[in-house]
């Protein structure tokens, strides 16, 4: 009979953690595994390093539950920096910032609502999409030239929160 050095019930857990900015999902999982003193853990879904949000983390046999969890729809909150030009389309690699003219609030709301529905888009090169097992953002940081395939997404609802012009 095999001798256990841990409490069998405590090794199987399913938790939701809030991943902070500036860290990859894998790096954050490593911290979570150390905190809970558990080597066997995984997460569902990957957030870009420059995104913060919820990761579902499973320990032990509970990682088998991921296939039963509904992953959509998701909710996103974004801050849009008008006039900023960035190679990565986020706060990394900002090339320049230009002052833009004040935009009509009704026009902003109209454009935001026009996004509702099914959209086809090409993900940015600085994304967590994988190309032959490697994250696109890693290849982009190394200066590799590559193309990502188009993706489809559905936007079910938009909500305008605020607008502040400099």
Label each residue range with its predicted role:
Residues 1-166:
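Catalytic/RNA-binding core of pseudouridine synthases
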């Amino acid at each position: 009979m095999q001798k256990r050095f841990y409490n069998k019930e405590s090794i199987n857990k399913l938790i939701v953690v809030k991943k902070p900015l500036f860290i990859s999902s894998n790096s954050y999982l490593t911290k979570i595994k150390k905190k809970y003193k558990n080597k066997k853990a995984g997460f569902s879904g990957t957030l870009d390093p420059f995104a913060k949000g919820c990761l579902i983390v499973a320990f032990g046999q509970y990682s088998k539950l991921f296939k039963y969890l509904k992953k959509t729809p998701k909710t996103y909150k974004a801050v849009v920096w008008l006039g900023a030009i960035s190679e990565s389309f986020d706060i990394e690699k900002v090339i320049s910032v230009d002052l833009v003219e004040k935009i009509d609030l009704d026009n902003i709301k109209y454009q935001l609502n026009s996004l509702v529905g099914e959209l086809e888009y090409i993900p940015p090169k600085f994304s967590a999409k994988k190309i032959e097992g490697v994250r696109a953002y890693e290849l982009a940081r190394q200066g590799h030239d590559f193309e990502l395939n188009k993706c489809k997404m559905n936007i079910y609802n938009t909500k305008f929160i605020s607008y502040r012009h400099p």
